[in-house]
């Protein structure tokens, strides 16, 4: 995964981090081949179709690994934390 980059070049002739649009490539392991999910506006600044949170991508990967959505992990003082926060993106599954 690549953190998104600003649609416009900055004053230093580079691009800064941009959390609104980014790309990710997945292959095998239960991912539908050739799938493209989501769409951005013409300047690649904001999503226009199927916006999702990175937690949904993590949930998709956990699902493919067989990790249950109600899995809890515990920190060093035994406080429970949900491992899976998002929801799997069903359209990416084979």
Task: Give the predicted meaning of each segment.
Residues 1-94:
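Ligand-binding pockets and gating/stacking loops
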